[in-house]
């Protein structure tokens, strides 16, 4: 069984945390301040996850391109 990279483990752990946050928010049992803190953490996790997915997509596009000499370069997301 191949080892997972640190990034994929981090992505999976972040996704699990995000799912837990969503469940807690949907329960409606949190105080307002706690709900806001959870929401803020969820937004941070979602943005980080989007960045990881964009980087993975770029790597796949490069690997599937016709240019056999294409090099992988670090992905720099556009700032909003």
From Swiss-Prot:
Give the UniProt keywords, A-Z: Cytoplasm, Exonuclease, Hydrolase, Nuclease
Reaction(s) this enzyme catalyzes, per UniProt: Exonucleolytic cleavage in either 5'- to 3'- or 3'- to 5'-direction to yield nucleoside 5'-phosphates
Q: Main localization of the protein?
A: cytoplasm
- Gene Ontology CC: cytosol; exodeoxyribonuclease VII complex
Tell me the Gene3D superfamilies matching this sequence: Exonuclease VII, small subunit
What's a single GO BP term from this record?
A: DNA catabolic process
One Gene Ontology molecular-function label: exodeoxyribonuclease VII activity
Give one Pfam family, short name only. Answer: Exonuc_VII_S
Superkingdom is Bacteria
Q: Which EC numbers does the record give?
A: 3.1.11.6
Report the locations given in the UniProt record. Cytoplasm
* InterPro entries listed in its UniProt record: Exonuc_VII_S, Exonuc_VII_ssu_sf
Q: What does this protein do?
A: Bidirectionally degrades single-stranded DNA into large acid-insoluble oligonucleotides, which are then degraded further into small acid-soluble oligonucleotides.
This protein's assembly is summarised as: Heterooligomer composed of large and small subunits.
Assigned protein family: Belongs to the XseB family.
Q: What is this protein called?
A: Exodeoxyribonuclease 7 small subunit
Protein source organism: Erwinia tasmaniensis (strain DSM 17950 / CFBP 7177 / CIP 109463 / NCPPB 4357 / Et1/99)
């Amino acid at each position: 069984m191949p080892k997972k990279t640190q990034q994929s483990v981090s992505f999976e752990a972040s996704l699990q945390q995000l799912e837990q946050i969503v469940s807690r928010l949907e329960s409606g049992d949190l105080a307002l301040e706690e709900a806001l803190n959870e929401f803020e953490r969820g937004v941070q996790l979602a943005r980080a996850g989007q960045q990881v997915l964009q980087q993975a997509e770029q790597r796949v596009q490069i690997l599937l391109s016709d240019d056999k000499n294409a090099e992988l370069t670090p992905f720099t997301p556009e700032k909003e």
